[in-house]
Amino acid sequence: MSAEQPMRVVVAGAGVAGLEAALALRELAGDLVAVELVAPESEFRYRPLSVAEPYGYGEMRRFPLDRLVEAAGATLRTGSVSELDADAKEVTLTDGTTIGYDTLLVATGVGTPEAVPGALTFGGAGEREAIGALLDRAKAGEVKRIVFTRPPTPLWPLPLYELAFQTAERLTDELARGVQIVVATPEPAPLDLFGRAASDEIARLLEIRSIEFRPHVGPLRWEDGALHVAPGGSLAADAVVSLPRLVGEPIEGLPQDDSGFVATDELGWVLGLSDVYAAGDITDFPVKQGGIAAEQADTVATAIAADAGGGRPPADLRARSAGPVADRDVSPLPPERA
């Protein structure tokens, strides 16, 4: 990069973190940077509303990705990064194309494979139809006990409780009687991630809705009407709905742990590499949530902008995502659900 040329910033991924970083860089650095996003998809999907979709409360919103990227003052390349050469400052796409960069931001998000064999995975293909079919079976008296569970791995746990509450609400509204709903998780208390006060409130709401809570449960598999759990034993279940396991997509040359996550410092620098950052669900931050991804992206963008000659200096930054979730303004349930 010369004094006359903008810094080439390549962003791998165009989810919340990737788009937020592009927007922040436009605001903070302007023409000092040339931002290119690389992503395989053509749409940006706003996932939070997907929890309500099977119950008729809303639909997952979709936006043309090219328009969002253009509005952020960046360019979009269709593809997926498969390899990183940090010494050469190049990434290689799955089709063999190489792209040079001055600074790289890895914001590729995560994959969502099945966590509990035999269970209905929320976040998998056909989830809306599958949950709709489960509700129909419960209303018909074919399902008497539904267990909602999650793996003991980093994720955003709130959707599990939303699914349980909305299932209870729908079955009550449609006068389906005799269906027991259970939330079985590795947590010691409901949504303990949010702190004691929020956890106590969720426990109260579960009790009001006659939803059983089973703590310290590590789901293994569902078969023959039983959810087998660690460290041993099983729970009776006519149906099981599980959140997926989250795994980072492998990129050769990028330091990743066994789950595919990337370790960074407080500014988002990937440990062990120069001029490579990471933000969003691909990082090893234990909570995976869009608001946290956006804050991480803002932190990274501020550091990149400062390096390019614009914005605030990195010394002024604080890793806002490093604090406990209980200290953040994240409501455990939307007001209309409480």
What function would you assign to each model-found segment?
Residues 115-142, 234-296:
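FAD-site-proximal beta/loop scaffold in flavoenzymes
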Residues 2-74, 152-193:
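Beta1-alpha1 glycine-rich phosphate/pyrophosphate-binding loop at the start
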